[in-house]
Every structure is written in C-alpha cells, then in structure tokens.
C-alpha cells in the first residue's frame, strides 16, 4: 500500500468520504505552493492533486489554463516541482500527493527518469488526462518495475459506457469520475444521467470512486453521496486562493469546512 491506498483504507474504516483538492504548482511561486500544501494538511485534506503546468492544457478550463500559463511565466518547471516536492517531504508533509500532468511532459523528460524522480521525491499518484487507456502500456511497464512507484489513476467519463469494466479491471488507488462533458471548472451542471453513470462505475469498481469537474461546495455532491466515495475540487479552489491572495488561512478554512460538510 502507498499513501493513497492507506488514506483511503482508513477513511473506509471510519465510514468517511475523501476530499481532494487541485493546486497548480509554482503559482505564484514554489514557496507559496508549499505553504498552501501544509495549510491543507493542517485542515485534514485527504489527498492533494498538484498540477504540473503545461503550455497546452487541453482537459482544463479557463481557470486552470490561466493558472498554468501564469506559473510557467513565473518559471515553474517539472524539475523545479520535483525539487519542491522533495522539500515538502523532508519538512514532514505526510499527505498523499498526486501529480496531474500531460503525457508530453512525461515523454520529453523520459518515462523511466520521470518515474524514478517521482519515487525519489514522494509522489504517490499520477493523473494523465491525455493518455488513452490503450496507450498506457509503456508507463505501466515502467511503474510496475518498482513497488514504490506512484499509482496511475484511471479516469472515466460519461462516454466511457461499455468500456468501464475494461478501464477498471486493474485500476488502483481511486477512480476519477469526470462528472460532465468538456473541460474542468464549468460549475455543478452535472450530466443528466450522472446517477446512472456513477452507479455503473461504482458497481464495477473494487476501489473508491471520486467525482470531479465543476464542484464548488459539499452541497454540490450531496445528492450523490450514497454512491460516491469522495469529491475533487479544482477550478474553484484555484479561484478561492487567488481571490484571497494565496492565504494559508483561506485554504485551511475551505478544506476544513468542505470536509466537515461532506461527512455531516
């Protein structure tokens, strides 16, 4: 078990749901990102998704695209983010961390080098939205070489119907359910058949099912809390941090409130 699996097993034992946030690394700088990570841990975050900025983030909506571009302009790079991760681990951060990034970044860094750096710096999971299931063979082979490798998180969407059993057969960690079509950050206008879709995913999944895309508050997911095992907030958290000048207090308050309401 790695940190993700340990945390999710503990939550299951406690009968609680997971809360996951997304933060763009290096926005406005690495020191601020580190402070926000520790602030979230203090508030009881379950898993942190850290976005690696990319110049063409096709799966992301305008908020995360803008954050990505700003971070790149401020000098954020994969190498710098690995260094930042190493520092937060050495400083005592224990929360599970998942990198969300595009395969182009992994490919240009070198798949084996990338995985080794993840192991070295305490990265627990990977979300690669532009890497189709059929093309995951190379990175899966490299990940399988070391038991300390990060987990490749499987994404499923409303158009995955019919493919869900195949997608989830060997999935680990958690399933990331895209709750609506299109890009991130559109608000809680969930797919009209979301309940049927999530029920099918839950039926096929041996691991926790998380819902993301367009979530702002725990109330957004309340109608589906009997199906899902947790919620992921991205664009709204980015906007909240920016509106509050990347205040640690704002991050702590938001995470603590969302977690409390999610498990009320």
UniProtKB/Swiss-Prot annotation:
Q: What is its EC number?
A: 4.2.1.20
Pathway annotation from the record: Amino-acid biosynthesis; L-tryptophan biosynthesis; L-tryptophan from chorismate: step 5/5
Q: Name one Pfam family in it.
A: Trp_syntA
Q: Which UniProt keywords apply?
A: Amino-acid biosynthesis, Aromatic amino acid biosynthesis, Lyase, Tryptophan biosynthesis
Which GO molecular function, any one, fits this protein according to its record? tryptophan synthase activity
Q: Describe the family membership recorded for this protein in Swiss-Prot or TrEMBL.
A: Belongs to the TrpA family.
* Record-linked HAMAP family: Trp_synth_alpha
In its UniProt entry, what is this protein called? Tryptophan synthase alpha chain
- This protein's species is Lachnospira eligens (strain ATCC 27750 / DSM 3376 / VPI C15-48 / C15-B4)
